[in-house]
Design a protein with these regions (language model features):
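Active-site-proximal beta-strand elements of phosphoester/diester hydrolases
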Residues: 7, 127-128, 163-167
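Histidine-centered divalent metal-coordination motifs
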Residues: 79, 131, 168
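A short secondary-structure junction motif
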Residues: 49-54, 83-93, 167-169
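C-terminal and late-domain segments of enzyme folds
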Residues: 135-195
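Pocket-forming structural segment of enzyme catalytic cores
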Residues: 76, 86-151
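Proline-centered loop/turn at the N-terminus of a beta-strand
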Residues: 74-76, 161
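Short, glycine/acidic-enriched loop or turn micro-motifs at the edges of active sites
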Residues: 10, 82, 134, 171
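N-terminal beta1-alpha1 cap of cysteine-dependent amidohydrolase-like domains
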Residues: 1-73, 80, 106, 175, ...
Length: 195
């Protein structure tokens, strides 16, 4: 399976690349529209602030293509990349996102931020989080969540071909790799069956 990891200057692309290769993916780190269109799936990583990330994506000219690709092929956002999938964020200044999943990004209410460390999600397995903002979306889009200081944090979201992981699966040990492998297998089923 060929995965285009979007290179827009805001992601830890090499750790993501290493994790994807470990589960058998062919990876291209790119901002080339031709390579993105040729991929079986798209992965949008992200580390940093929402406004700067959207500015960087706009600077590459990729925003219209990414919106189109999300309707045609599996699309995964990780950490800030997941937040960018939504309509908007209040981080810094109100900023429009990609709008691939209905919802918004807001600052978490916890007294101790950023949320850095390991928290349980599915099957009481721990994954690694680093963030101060979280998504607010319809319950139907939330696949799994974590609890941070009494606050529910959507950890995995999904709508159509679009999936997001708020945590870093590439830094979450064998369970993180297993989640990436499950995503890969769902992409391969999509390629094989068309659904």
């Amino acid at each position: 399976m060929n995965v285009a990891v979007i290179d827009y200057g805001m992601g830890n692309v090499f750790n993501v690349e290493r994790a994807l290769k470990a589960i058998g993916c062919h990876v291209v780190i790119t901002n080339d529209p031709i390579e993105i269109e040729a991929a079986d799936a798209i992965l949008l990583p992200g580390v940093g602030a929402f406004p700067q990330a959207m500015a960087s994506l706009h600077a590459t000219g990729l925003v219209p293509l990414l919106k189109q690709m999300a309707t045609e092929k599996p699309f995964l956002g990780i950490c800030l990349g997941m937040q960018l999938l939504f309509n908007s964020s209040t981080e810094g200044v109100l900023t429009e996102g990609l709008g691939l999943i209905e919802g918004r990004v807001e600052r978490m209410r916890a007294k101790r931020l950023p949320h850095v460390g390991w928290n349980s999600i599915l099957r009481d397995e721990d994954v690694y989080f680093v963030h101060s903002y979280h998504v607010v979306t319809d319950e139907a889009h939330i696949v799994a969540s974590a609890d941070y200081m009494g606050e529910r944090v959507p950890a995995i979201v999904h709508d159509g071909l679009v999936t997001g992981m708020q945590f870093h699966p590439e830094k979450s040990g064998t369970f993180g790799l297993r989640l990436l492998k499950e995503w890969k297998e769902s992409v391969e089923r999509e390629i094989t069956t068309g659904n």
